Amino acid sequence: MLNLKQIEFCLDKIGDMFPHAECELVHSNPFELVVAVALSAQCTDALVNRVTKTLFQKYKRPEDYLAVPLEELQQDIKSIGLYRNKAKNIQKLSKMIIEDYGGEVPRDRDELVKLPGVGRKTANVVVSVAFGVPAIAVDTHVERVSKRLGICRWKDSVLEVEKTLMRKVPKEDWSVTHHRLIFFGRYHCKAQSPRCAECPLLSLCREGQKRDKKGLVKR
């Protein structure tokens, strides 16, 4: 496991690699972000952005999603995985935002997770990106990178990864660390083909060292 100084070194290096890392889901307000993140489960941001480009022209407010039959909304997002269930959740959360929150997306994470289809990860993304609240949202990239480097234990749950990162990373750096770990995992430390040979963290990375000993790191 990495110590705090090593973690700081790793995060600084990742910051050098991806200094402009930010949320890649296109949105213009908190409600659009909630919808986009809800759509992004088990789906790429690129595909979500292709769908929301037209979706957000047709549906601008929570009321708009309730003004059409469920089947119509399902057709509008059909190219996205799990579209039937996601459409149901979008209509349900739209109704709840109108009835319980006066048409405005709640700023509190504990309130956000009450919305259908909004889990802890989605809520953390929304409070961080839309409202500037320090948070670390653990997606597949953040989890993979944290475990490969040895910031977290292999057996840690997603919630344990989040809590470990919150302990080991200064609070003021939570949000930027979240985005940089995503970029590092998405574009460099990929699930199937991590770019270990050109990685500045290879000497510290337990997964990279293991791959190197097996002759899997081609220089």
UniProtKB/Swiss-Prot annotation:
Pfam annotation, one family: HHH
Keyword Glycoprotein (UniProt): no
Enzyme nomenclature, EC number: 4.2.99.18
Organism superkingdom: Bacteria
Disruption phenotype: Cells lacking this gene have a 5-fold increased spontaneous mutation frequency. A triple MutS/MutL/nth disruption has a 280-fold increased spontaneous mutation frequency.
Residues holding [4Fe-4S] cluster: 189, 196, 199, 205
PROSITE patterns assigned: ENDONUCLEASE_III_1 (PS00764), ENDONUCLEASE_III_2 (PS01155)
The keyword Nucleotide-binding belongs to this UniProt entry's keyword annotation: no
Free-text cofactor note: Binds 1 [4Fe-4S] cluster.
Enzyme class, first EC level, given as a word: lyase
Positions of the HhH domain: 109-128
NCBIfam families linked: nth
Similarity field: Belongs to the Nth/MutY family.
Protein name: Endonuclease III
Source organism of the structure: Bacillus subtilis (strain 168)
